[in-house]
From Swiss-Prot:
The gene is MT-ND6. Coiled coil: none annotated. It is a multi-pass membrane protein. GO terms for cellular component: mitochondrial membrane. This is NADH-ubiquinone oxidoreductase chain 6. The chain crosses the membrane at residues 1-21, 27-47, 48-68, 87-107, 139-159. It is an enzyme of class 7 (translocase). It comes from the Eukaryota. Pfam families: Oxidored_q3. Core subunit of the mitochondrial membrane respiratory chain NADH dehydrogenase (Complex I) that is believed to belong to the minimal assembly required for catalysis. Complex I functions in the transfer of electrons from NADH to the respiratory chain. The immediate electron acceptor for the enzyme is believed to be ubiquinone. Its EC number is 7.1.1.2. Belongs to the complex I subunit 6 family.
Length: 173
């Protein structure tokens, strides 16, 4: 199980690197899917099933739609591939930043921040992420609606920014 969790963590980091150093929007979608599946699998292996399911639906249901619209509106006739030197340079730079962060984090990692587990150290019979469902639908409904409208506004802003002056792949008939 330990090797599986380490493998999911490695896939999550590689997916994040793929999104950050994507040569074109076509390949950014692949990195996003890899990172979201690995991250949600990681949370699922830690026992946080509800949060994992919600994040999986948000990432693949919301962000993937924005990527699809971006790809359809910004068709690139000659997309860069993963092997181009500019993309490899970005990837190497991100790996260097990651290694420096791990080295610096190793010195800070000895501090105790008081993190508790999902069942609050066995104190409750109901896990904390399942009790969050009731709070989400009772007290958090207003913020949920505000977040939905914000995501819709973000979708239109991204569509307008991607379209620009050239109208992308959609042409006037």
């Amino acid at each position: 199980m330990t090797y599986f969790v380490l493998f999911l963590g490695l896939c999550f980091v590689l997916g994040g690197l793929a999104v950050a150093s994507n040569p074109s929007p076509y390949y950014g979608v692949v990195g996003l899917v890899l990172a979201s599946v690995a991250g949600c699998g990681w949370l699922l292996s830690l026992g946080v099933s509800f949060v994992s399911l919600v994040l999986f639906m948000v990432y693949l249901g919301g962000m993937l739609v924005v990527f699809v619209y971006s790809v359809s509106l910004a068709a690139d006739p000659f997309p860069e591939a993963w092997g181009d030197w500019g993309v490899v340079g970005y990837g190497v730079g991100f790996v260097v930043v990651l290694v420096v962060g791990l080295v610096v984090g190793g010195f800070v990692g000895d501090l105790d921040f008081g993190v508790v587990t999902v069942d609050s150290v066995g104190m409750f019979s109901v896990r904390l992420d399942f009790s969050g469902v009731a709070m989400f639908y009772s007290c958090g409904v207003g913020m949920f609606l505000v977040a939905g409208w914000g995501l819709l506004l973000t979708l239109f802003v991204v569509l307008e920014l991607v379209r620009g002056l050239s109208r992308g792949a959609i042409r006037a008939v």
